């Protein structure tokens, strides 16, 4: 395969210029200004050629936070449809969460998921639970789960309310050099999850979920991260104060990482009034001031990861009243475009800075040999037109629960390549 005429964007090296890429046996073998079948002895006349003129060629995107709902909830999504959605969105690697049924808290369930994931065209990693059955009480065997292939640990979807248990889990993860990711919402503060406590919840006649519910646990866990030395990920950060807390503890030396989702840096709580349950998620969309602080955190590097929290639900579930419908939206197929639309086109981040948070940063955190375009590296690419406008309307995901349907976005994935194979083409 030869990818020609595109701008190669590699955040790991800072490369951002017109280059061709020669791929052989799933690896990048040459990056040069002009590679042709005739001039390069390693190429043959049968080479597949992708003309990337007018496009950017970036490393295959990596999402550290997806829910494929498999096993147990496959009416919402499964490993196959989730992988198709990932490929359509430019993602070649994903990290699946552990809140399935059964929970990924044991070696057998972990190995089953990983075995089925290997049948797909993307690279599927699996995080294991921190606690048995996500109850926040009993330790899992982290060492055995790491040995069996877990890439990290998380009880995502449910917060760890016991500080001593959380601290012990961080210490154990640190010994194994494994990241531990935390869902930060203290249920003691929350009456109605998924909607911010504020003007919108008041208009709906409900109490909602105040930002202090997140901030209190973020403050606690940033301190525990500092003391434990663990790589701690604050998942789907939604509060501006939470961003400030993370920044403060990073300066103190804590090995803290933070995820921002495209919905939290694009939308505010007002979206609930327009889109109803399609804009309901945990943690909820908050105020414009919170959104601006999340963007500031992305700009200064406090937030080093952009992750989707891809959370499919059925149309029947999302059609329930706002207090009864489940929280969460799909995100794999719109993530890159939302980053371009909300961050790059508005001048907040450069294209390399956006891609850094979606490729090399997650790869380094999870010790993945991906996320870069360099000779000898895996031939994983997202090839996209940064200026093409489009409107999301049909999805490869089994579900379609998103407020972004019908919204004009800029930046369209044209090809996704994983291991030297085209796994998605916009044709």
Identify the role of each PLM range:
Residues 1-43:
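N-terminal metal-binding scaffold of metallo-dependent hydrolase/deaminase domains
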Residues 36-57:
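Active-site metal-binding motif and surrounding structural segment of the metallo-beta-lactamase
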Residues 203-231, 278, 297-300, 304-306, ...:
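His/Asp/Glu-enriched, well-ordered alpha-helical/loop segment
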């Amino acid at each position: 395969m030869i990818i020609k005429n595109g701008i190669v964007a590699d955040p790991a090296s800072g490369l951002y210029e017109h280059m061709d890429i020669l791929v052989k046996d799933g690896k990048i073998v040459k990056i040069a200004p002009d590679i042709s079948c005739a001039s390069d002895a390693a190429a043959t006349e049968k080479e597949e050629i992708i003309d990337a003129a007018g496009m950017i060629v970036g490393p295959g995107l990596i999402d550290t936070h997806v829910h494929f709902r498999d096993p147990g909830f496959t009416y919402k999504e499964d490993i196959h449809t989730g992988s198709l959605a990932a490929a359509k969105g430019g993602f070649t690697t994903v990290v699946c969460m552990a809140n399935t049924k059964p929970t990924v808290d044991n070696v057998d369930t972990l190995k089953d998921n990983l075995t089925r994931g290997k049948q797909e065209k993307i690279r599927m990693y699996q995080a294991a639970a921190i606690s048995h059955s996500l109850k926040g009480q009993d330790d899992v065997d982290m060492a055995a789960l790491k040995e069996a292939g877990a890439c990290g640990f998380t009880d995502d979807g449910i917060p760890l309310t016991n500080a001593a248990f959380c601290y012990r889990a961080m210490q154990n993860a640190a010994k194994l050099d494994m990241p531990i990711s935390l869902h930060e919402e203290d249920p003691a503060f929350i009456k109605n999850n998924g909607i911010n406590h504020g003007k919108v919840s008041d208009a709906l006649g409900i109490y909602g979920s105040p930002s202090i519910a997140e901030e209190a646990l973020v403050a606690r866990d940033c301190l525990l991260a500092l003391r434990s030395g663990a790589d701690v990920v604050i998942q789907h950060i939604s509060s501006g104060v939470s961003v400030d807390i993370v920044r403060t503890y990073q300066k103190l030396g804590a090995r803290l990482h933070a995820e921002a989702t495209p919905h939290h840096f694009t939308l505010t709580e007002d979206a609930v009034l327009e889109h109803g349950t399609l804009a309901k998620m945990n943690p909820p969309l908050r105020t414009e001031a919170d959104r601006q602080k999340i963007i500031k955190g992305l700009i200064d590097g406090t937030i080093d990861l952009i992750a989707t929290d891809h959370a499919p639900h059925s149309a029947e579930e999302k059609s329930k009243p706002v207090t009864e419908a489940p929280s969460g939206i799909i995100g794999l197929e719109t993530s890159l475009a939302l980053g371009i639309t909300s961050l790059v086109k508005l001048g907040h981040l450069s294209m390399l800075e956006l891609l850094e948070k979606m490729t090399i940063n997650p790869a380094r955190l999870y010790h993945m040999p991906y996320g870069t375009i360099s000779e000898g590296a895996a031939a994983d690419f997202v090839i996209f037109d940064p200026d093409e406008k489009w409107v999301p309307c049909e999805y490869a995901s089994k579900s379609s629960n998103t407020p972004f349907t019908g919204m004009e976005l800029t930046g369209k994935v044209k090809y996704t390549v994983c291991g030297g194979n085209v796994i998605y083409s916009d044709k």
